[in-house]
Amino acid sequence: MDTGPLVERAFAVRAGIGWIGRNQHLIIPGYGSFVALGLLLLDVKVEPDPSLLDRSLCGVCQRCVEACPALIIGKEPFAAKHCVSYLTQSKEGLTDEECKRLGLRIFGCDTCQEVCPHNRKRMKDEQTDSFPSSLRRGVDLLETLNLTKAEFQQRFHSTAAGWRGKGVLQRNAFLALRNVQDSRYRLWLREHEKDKDKLVPPIISPYL
């Protein structure tokens, strides 16, 4: 969820460097959609370069449509607020269906990018290197649920999850444990139910 007023994808399309794929991501030929976009704002008028691309190259591919856990790709209008990536970052209350949709995800969802043929090479060559070494083996859900503020900052400050705050990540870890009915989830509940007003983060309380 970007917080800035400028939509980089739209400018990138107008510049002709790529197209908006069926999964709503900017796809750049040879690079796919796992890219970071930046803007340079000028106070002088410049003539734009000719567009390098003026059409979508998704063709008849439906991989992202079929893989989307929220089942929103390919439908108009695109319901961005139902996207699982959005839900994992939202501080708003989640419905029971949305909670189930998160599955084991605690932050973000790249399923529609992971299945995209245009990302095949990038997934193989570079995606793993984009994660901090401390997170490459995954995240322990119960450990995440019990993180102190200092521990959260130390582990997640350099990731996209760092800016969203500890509460959101812990809520998602709690829901992930609940979704798989992990025995540790039931143990955690028993340990906290006697004094949940003090021990349970407020953002988790509605889901107990």
Feature roles, as predicted:
Residues 1-135:
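Catalytic cores of enzyme domains
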